[in-house]
Regions:
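Alpha-helical transmembrane segments and immediately membrane-proximal extracytoplasmic
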Residues: 1-302
């Protein structure tokens, strides 16, 4: 587990698998912590702490987000909230982040410039966005469970499972190239764009390329088909997690909500870029049941 998941996820994403590398990296970090605990014959409590340190360091390193890594471990892995637990986890997060900065530079995963500051009259839209993200996260989790059950029934037919999953994934990517791999480049287009011509670049290399009038339909289809691409990837034998798909769907869902809000003039104007970012935090919160992780992760990713 110290290396197999990293290699498998790299191959999966490299060949277009619509998943993220974060979950395998967390598994690797946890496995390293567990192995260290066994090597030095630590007691069970210390070994669990080392597992948490490995998981948090993995999140902090891959996202360059030390606070999010710390909060993720506290919220998701439910490590004891005491100084004896917090200090080792914080040290591992900061060390992993510094290591990544040294070897990978200080660039952010997502490029975002705040051009429309927060205004109080956008509060109703933000509340409704939260409700929308909650519904989308519920759809994501339920659909994932159904698809996993379907592919589980094909476990006795590995070649049929591989062929069927590959057929679903390749068909979806053919129509919606944004589903290829992690999809972070597509999210960056939505975050950096300021008009339909710039946002329309998300449809490049697709059958809808150059048809900006179909942007809203493209965004909607991608939002609700990403879960099938992710399920087909993992169900057919790929290795990846739902962290990146949650960020991807959240960005597209937030943009879709804001775009529809502005098109139909439901209320005051809301900036699509801001709501795409808030949608990412909303989906992470809904899927992982970790609100603080969503807040700090998005703050540190941009």
């Amino acid at each position: 587990n110290c290396w197999s998941s990293v290699v498998a996820s790299g191959i999966t994403i490299g060949f277009g698998g619509s998943v993220g590398a974060e979950a395998p990296i967390v598994l690797t970090g946890s496995a390293i912590g567990s192995n260290l605990g066994q090597i030095f014959r630590m007691d069970k409590k210390t070994m669990m702490l080392l597992v948490g340190c490995g998981a948090s360091a993995a999140i902090a390193g891959v996202f360059k987000a030390p606070i999010a890594g710390l909060v993720f471990t506290l919220e998701v892995l439910m490590v004891d909230l005491s100084m004896a637990s917090l200090l080792p986890i914080l040290i591992s997060c900061v060390t992993a982040t510094c290591f990544t900065y040294i070897f990978d530079g200080d660039s952010s995963l997502f490029e975002f410039t705040l051009t429309n500051p927060w205004e109080l009259d956008r509060t109703p839209a933000c509340i409704l966005l939260g409700v929308f993200c909650g519904l989308v996260s519920l759809y994501f989790m339920r659909t994932m469970s159904v698809c996993e059950g379907f592919f589980g029934k094909l476990s006795q037919y590995p070649y049929a499972k591989l062929l069927f999953g590959g057929l679903i994934l390749s068909t979806l990517i053919f129509f919606f190239p944004s589903l290829y791999g992690e999809g972070y480049s597509a999210v960056n287009i939505l975050l950096k764009g300021s008009n339909e011509a710039e946002w329309g670049q998300v449809m490049n290399r697709s059958l809808f390329s150059g048809q900006d009038n179909l942007l809203i339909f493209y965004i909607a289809f991608v939002t609700f088909t990403k879960v099938f691409a992710t399920s087909a990837t993992n169900g057919s034998g790929g290795c990846g997690g739902t962290f990146a798909p949650s960020l991807f769907i959240g960005g597209f869902a937030g943009f879709l909500f804001a775009r529809l809000w502005n098109i139909y003039q439901v209320g005051v104007y809301v900036p699509e870029q801001n709501f795409a970012l808030m949608g990412m935090a909303g989906l992470i919160t809904g899927v992982m049941h970790a609100p603080l992780t969503g807040i700090f992760l998005i703050a540190e990713l941009t």
